[in-house]
Amino acid sequence: MTKYALVGDVGGTNARLALCDIASGEISQAKTYSGLDYPSLEAVVRVYLDEHGVSVEDGCIAIACPITGDWVAMTNHTWAFSIAEMKKNLGFSHLEIINDFTAVSMAIPMLKKEHLIQFGGGEPVDGKPIAVYGAGTGLGVAHLVHVDKRWISLPGEGGHVDFAPNSEEEAMILEILRAEIGHVSAERVLSGPGLVNLYRAIVKSDNRLPENLRPKDITERALADSCIDCRRALSLFCVIMGRFGGDLALTMGTFGGVYIAGGIVPRFLEFFKASGFRGGFEDKGRFKDYVHGIPVYLIVHDNPGLLGSGAHLRQTLGHIL
């Protein structure tokens, strides 16, 4: 008889839940709920389990916020809870709450070739560190290493490191944003809101007033080639994505590959392919040759957060991935 566990991927707006076959890791019965419609994550879980008529003992839910102890307070939502209390209330034997990019990193060993698009470099080296990052509402970062037949995710808040410009245009962006917001992290330029920041800074650098555009508007105008400022912003976004990925590669020697997740890049995939992304990735001066062979992949799996939550839980329960 198939034994299932509950897996989840929760962001600031939606909560996506599914079942994971503990033996195979297969994800099924995925359903998305609006977080605004429920008073707590526990309430969403109860609705999901009731709707699907299943009883589970184990669960792993990825959440887009730092996980530092038993108490979880979401960054972009009002939900806050004790992991131990939620586990007790649901009657689970095992419940883990993990960072969303911990889940994405743990999905990487489970991905197949059709789930990936490669951007330069050679083949990944088995056993070497892996980096994963992605721009969405924010900028998520994690690393993954393989030790003693176990995958170990190394989460953190790498999206909040300093934005490090390496061209006159990027230095201009930093100067304008610093005057507006003070500290300028990488996330301030590599995210949906970050794309807006890039556009606004480009326009303001020419002593003009920027329009009140959303990330979607900027992307659409750039792809339609109807706004030179939007096209410059999107082009610069791609280059800075490359620079940041190259920084991750240097920091951990990620010869196992660098992986891009998140919801932004797939929206302008052809533009990204033709952009200066790989040039930015390899623009490391004396260490250009060091990163030249490191492959970069875009993850195109529909639910890497769910897949990775399941992988994390299965490994915790003793399965070898």
Curated annotation (Swiss-Prot):
Give the EC number(s) listed in the UniProt record: 2.7.1.2
Gene Ontology process terms (BP): glycolytic process
Reaction catalysed?
A: D-glucose + ATP = D-glucose 6-phosphate + ADP + H(+)
Q: Which residues bind ATP?
A: 8-13
* Keyword entries, A-Z: ATP-binding, Cytoplasm, Glycolysis, Kinase, Nucleotide-binding, Transferase
List locations, semicolon-separated: Cytoplasm
Spell out the GO cellular component terms annotated for this protein, sorted alphabetically and separated by semicolons. Answer: cytosol
GO terms (molecular function) for this protein are:
ATP binding; D-glucose binding; glucokinase activity
Q: Which NCBIfam families match?
A: glk (TIGR00749), PRK00292.1-1 (NF001414), PRK00292.1-3 (NF001416)
Q: Which family does it belong to?
A: Belongs to the bacterial glucokinase family.
Record's protein name = Glucokinase
Organism of origin: Salmonella typhi
